[in-house]
UniProtKB/Swiss-Prot annotation:
May play a role during embryogenesis. It is found in: Chromosome, Centromere, Kinetochore. Residues 95-112, 192-201 have a biased composition (Basic and acidic residues). The modification N6-methyllysine is found at residue 219. The modification Phosphoserine is found at residues 82, 85-86, 116, 216, 250. Residues 178-217 are annotated as: Hydrophilic. This is Craniofacial development protein 1. The lineage of its organism: Eukaryota, Metazoa, Chordata, Craniata, Vertebrata. Pfam families: BCNT. It comes from Homo sapiens. Keywords: Centromere, Chromosome, Developmental protein, Isopeptide bond, Kinetochore, Methylation, Phosphoprotein, Ubl conjugation. InterPro entries: BCNT-C (IPR011421), Swc5/CFDP1/2 (IPR027124). Residues 1-156, 192-224 are annotated as: Disordered.
């Protein structure tokens, strides 16, 4: 007996429940298993009071070869999850549609308010009173009349006439006549007209001399002396430089090359441009030499 008591029955493998193979199930075994499952389900429902009961939606587990299977439960869970996700998507879409509709309504309200504001304010600012319109028309008329007067004044100088002036010069005992076209309002034309007016009464003096009486010998002698002095008066002399310039101007007018020469002189190869360049070079050289002298003079 002592030997029998000393044996460890808790670790023995012989007391384990016998599990038959898949092909050895009997009807009694199946019924007992179903009853055990029902008892276990009732105990679990009593322990989990106040929670959601999922046992009603879950069917009785079936026995198959190799153990229990829960395929139906997994399918139902997947269906319930898909239904929940679809319902959530529908809710989100409905909320988005509501948000879009609310934004459109808000924009319409803002547009209506802005249009009403413009209707209230716009016409008053745009429509000026009749007095202001009249004043504006009067100012426009006065300004337009002033502009016309100014335009006429500007056009008047353009219509000035040109006058030909003939001057007589003495060059080496020869009489040289120079004819130029000058504006009638120029100083040269005015001086020429004044000289002609002075010469006219003096030219009429010889015709009045024979009518003088015999006792006026003094006056006759003075008149004759003045006339002889004017006749023998020396003409304005012309220098060689002025004569050559006059000949060159007349040659350009005859040949018609005045414009061509002016364009050529304005170019880089013209005499005037080259002379200006050389003058600039000389001036620059002078400045450099001056700076050197000043730098040497400083202590």
């Amino acid at each position: 007996m002592e030997e029998f008591d000393s044996e460890d029955f808790s670790t023995s493998e012989e007391d384990e429940d016998y599990v038959p193979s898949g092909g050895e199930y009997s009807e009694d075994d199946v019924n007992e298993l179903v009853k055990e499952d029902e008892v276990d389900g009732e105990e679990q429902t009593q322990k989990t009071q106040g929670k959601k009961r999922k046992a009603q939606s879950i069917p009785a587990r079936k026995r198959r070869q190799g153990g229990l299977s829960l395929e139906e439960e997994e399918e139902e869970d997947a269906n319930s999850e898909s239904e929940g996700s679809s319902s959530e998507e529908e809710d989100d879409a409905a909320e988005q549609e509501k948000g879009i509709g609310s934004e459109d309504a808000r924009k319409k309200k803002e547009d209506e308010l802005w249009a009403s504001f413009l209707n209230d304010v716009g016409p008053k600012s745009k429509v000026p009173p009749s007095t202001q319109v009249k004043k504006g028309e009067e100012t426009e008329e006065t300004s337009s009349s002033k502009l016309l007067v100014k335009a006429e004044e500007l056009e008047k100088p353009k219509e000035t006439e040109k006058v030909k002036i003939t001057k007589v010069f003495d060059f080496a005992g020869e009489e040289v006549r120079v004819t130029k076209e000058v504006d009638a309002t120029s100083k040269e034309a005015k001086s020429f007209f004044k000289q002609n007016e002075k010469e006219k009464p003096q030219a009429n003096v010889p015709s009045a001399l024979p009518s003088l009486p015999a006792g006026s010998g003094l006056k006759r002698s003075s008149g004759m002396s003045s006339l002889l002095g004017k006749i023998g008066a020396k003409k304005q002399k012309m220098s060689t430089l002025e004569k050559s310039k006059l000949d060159w101007e007349s040659f350009k007018e005859e040949e018609g090359i005045g414009e061509e020469l002016a364009i050529h002189n304005r170019g880089k190869e013209g005499y005037i441009e080259r002379k200006a360049f050389l003058d600039r070079v000389d001036h620059r050289q002078f400045e450099i030499e001056r700076d050197l002298r000043l730098s040497k003079m400083k202590p």
